[in-house]
Regions:
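Ser/Thr/Asn(+Pro)-rich, low-complexity disordered segments
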Residues: 27-462
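N-terminal export signals
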Residues: 5-23
Length: 462
């Protein structure tokens, strides 16, 4: 494993953070380190991107020449798009190279089979064909439209359209049929259990049925789909108030919430919160970092809602830090769904700040992308945590970035890098190094006119 260059590059930043070097020198050292991390992370995304322009799900970095996986998803493709825009914005590639990469991906997306205006959940990253059998096992793959995965592809396409006016008309045509009301069940006060005013998880096209669940928890990554639909007018603004800050107090959940019933924009809702280590917050579903903090990489929730979302994001990060360093005593923190270091995929989180009774537990597995998501809210602590992971476990692959996860109890480091997680790393670094770089499409138009007023009225009661 190629570790030496990273550790040498990180030494100056680490010393600056730890020893209080003069401010200007510390800033230069830290920025150089973050730019190095971005550059290498972008190289990993390039390595995952196939000849037709689709970013595959993952790469195994144990070989000298990492090979992309067969499968990809709409989320992975979106990650490739916004990472390319970020690379140009940070000077890693020039504008011409950005255009070539975006154009290749947009052309591939134009050819992908769709249904009801949305993209299927699994494609062959090398051919663009819808997957009907899972690579390696041959298990059947049902054709499925995922609301949240489509949201991340649409986000990537909007970022690409904003960055490259030449591609904008083609992307607008692609998005013309993406009507989020397809996933929405309008609210019915006479039967809110069957008609909750929320988004379905998805739709099976082989038998024309929706999933049996809705995305009810507000502080989770599917709220990106909600914001997109409200912004483009395909979802009513009151849909936002029909999502849960916590479950209703009489429902079984991780802890009994405190709060009160309030009426906002004509919607009667439970304004609830949890308390963790003396800290009031609105929980996510499982207590993971990406549920809470992937969306604000793009939608400026903290600045549009400083007393609600802004406070909650910081408290979510602080809770993760204290869970890892104090409650469990791991010496490291950052818990979010990731590759299992020994193989496979699992959800990790801080159980106490998630609504689900089962929750996501930390199990001693930290994932670097969680620290990057925290970086806009706790920069120095996130950088120090990442440097410790690189130093103590060899978690950094020179030229490609951080491996996906580390079991800090055993020292086992994942052999893989995942497109989703590297895409979050790239977006987080873009936000830290060039604030707002990927947020332009989500600060204007319907986002400014319809989403921002909702967030301004948000009051979590914390």
């Amino acid at each position: 494993m190629k570790r030496r260059t990273l550790l040498a590059a990180g030494a100056g930043a680490s010393a600056a953070l730890a020893l209080g070097s003069p401010a200007a020198a510390a800033a230069r050292d830290t920025e150089a380190l973050l730019r190095r991390w971005f550059r290498d992370t972008y190289r990993s995304i390039e390595a995952m991107t196939t000849g037709i322009g689709l970013t595959a799900d993952k790469i195994d970095v144990t070989s000298a020449d990492p090979v992309p996986s067969v499968n990809t998803s709409p989320t992975n493709i979106g990650c490739g798009l916004w990472s390319t825009v970020a690379a140009a914005g940070l000077g890693v590639i020039d504008t011409r190279t950005m255009h070539r990469g975006l154009a290749r991906t947009v052309a591939a997306v134009e050819r992908l089979e769709r249904a009801h205006g949305f993209w299927f959940n699994w494609y062959d990253a090398h051919t663009g064909a819808v997957l009907t059998e899972w690579p390696g096992t041959g298990d059947p793959v049902r054709p499925f439209l995922s609301s949240v995965d489509n949201a991340w592809l649409v986000a990537g396409l909007l970022i690409a359209a904003d960055a490259d006016p030449v591609l904008r008309p083609r992307i607008e045509r692609l998005l013309a049929d993406a009507d989020w009301s397809f996933f929405h069940t309008p609210y019915d006060a006479d039967d809110p259990a069957a008609n909750p005013g929320q988004l379905r998880g998805g739709f099976w096209t082989d038998d024309d049925t929706y999933t049996g669940h809705w995305y009810g928890a507000l502080n989770t990554e599917p709220r990106m789909a909600s914001y997109l639909g409200i912004a483009d007018g395909s979802l009513p603004p009151e849909h936002y108030w029909h999502t849960f800050r916590t479950m209703l107090p009489e429902w079984e959940q991780e802890q009994r919430p405190e709060g009160e019933y309030v009426t906002v924009d004509g919607v009667r809702m439970w304004r609830g919160h949890y308390t963790y280590r003396g800290r009031r917050l609105v929980p996510s579903w499982g207590g993971s970092m990406f549920e809470a903090l992937m969306v604000p990489l793009f939608v400026p929730e903290a600045s549009w809602s400083p007393k609600a979302w802004g406070v909650n994001h910081r408290r979510h990060v602080r809770s993760q830090i204290e869970h890892g360093l104090v409650e469990e005593g791991y010496g490291y923190w950052g818990f979010s769904p990731a590759n299992i270091p020994d193989g496979g995929y699992s959800e990790y989180g801080v159980d106490a700040i998630g609504m689900s009774v089962e929750g996501y537990t930390s199990k001693g597995v930290v994932t670097p992308h969680a620290s990057f998501l925290a970086m806009p809210f706790a920069r120095d602590e996130a950088i120090a945590n990442l440097l410790r992971m690189a130093r103590d476990f060899g978690a950094y692959e020179d030229g490609l970035g951080f491996r996906d996860s580390v079991d800090v109890r055993t020292g086992r480091v994942s052999d893989f890098m995942l497109a989703l997680d590297q895409g979050m790393v790239a977006a987080a670094l873009a936000q830290v190094l060039s604030p707002g770089l990927l947020q332009r499409p989500f600060r204007t138009g319907g986002f400014a006119a319809r989403v921002r007023p909702l967030l301004a009225r948000e009051d979590f009661g914390i």
